[in-house]
Structure formats: C-alpha cells, structure tokens
C-alpha cells in the first residue's frame, strides 16, 4: 500500500491537513525518506507512557501520559526531514511516538489516540483539528 498511499500523500501535502495514525504515521515518514524497521518487541494492545518534548507546538511540553499501541514497526533513527519534528517519545524505549509539521499541517501518532488505552485521546485529535 505504500506506493499508492505515498502518491496520495504527496498530492495533498501542503494543500490539506493530514493526520497519520499508526501505519499512517509510518507511511508519511516513509514518504519523507525515512526507513521503517521492525521493533525488538511487538506492541499489540499495549499501554505505554509517552513524554511530550520541547519541540511540540500543539501539546503540553514535558507532559507524560499513557497511550495505546498496536504496532510491530518503528521509525529508524536518526531521521531528519524539513519542517518535521519528533514531538513525543516512549518513556521506556525512546521510540518516536508523534511528529508535527506545523508549516504543511501534517501530524502523526505511532499510537492510537482513539483507543481506550490512550488517555485524553479525543483532546489530542481536537488540538490537531484546531491547529
């Protein structure tokens, strides 16, 4: 699905607000030149704590909260793309858990904000929709 999804992503980049969740997070970063790799541990139905870092423009910097994870792949780091900032990381593993591109209005979560395992998931989506 990546080739077709990447084509659609590139068509709307900078024209429409884009939110990538889980595989969408991976697909957007892949389209921006990132490598996506297998994790040592698979997280299906797993709750992890994340930390919002200083580069976030949307979320409370320094805040920790729990999120629902359902994935076996992750972003290979280091990763750098113009206007993309990794804004949340898993407290335990340090894995990238969200990004923001506030210029093109592109956002992504490696976790599932809609999951009952994610605390305040609706608030996360509302903040992106109002950005």
Regions found by a protein language model. Name each.
Residues 25:
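Catalytic nucleophile loop
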């Amino acid at each position: 699905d990546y080739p077709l999804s990447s084509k659609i992503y590139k068509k709307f980049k900078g024209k429409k607000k884009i939110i990538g969740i889980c595989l969408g997070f991976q697909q957007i970063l892949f389209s921006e030149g990132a490598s996506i790799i297998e994790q040592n541990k698979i997280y299906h139905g797993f709750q992890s704590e994340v930390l919002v870092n200083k580069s976030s423009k949307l979320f409370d910097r320094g805040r920790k909260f729990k999120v629902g994870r359902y994935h076996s792949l992750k972003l290979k780091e280091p990763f750098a793309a113009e206007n993309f900032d990794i804004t949340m990381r898993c407290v335990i593993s340090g894995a990238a858990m969200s990004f923001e591109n506030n210029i093109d209005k592109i956002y992504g979560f490696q976790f599932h904000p809609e999951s009952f395992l994610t605390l305040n998931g609706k608030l996360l989506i509302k903040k992106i929709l109002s950005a």
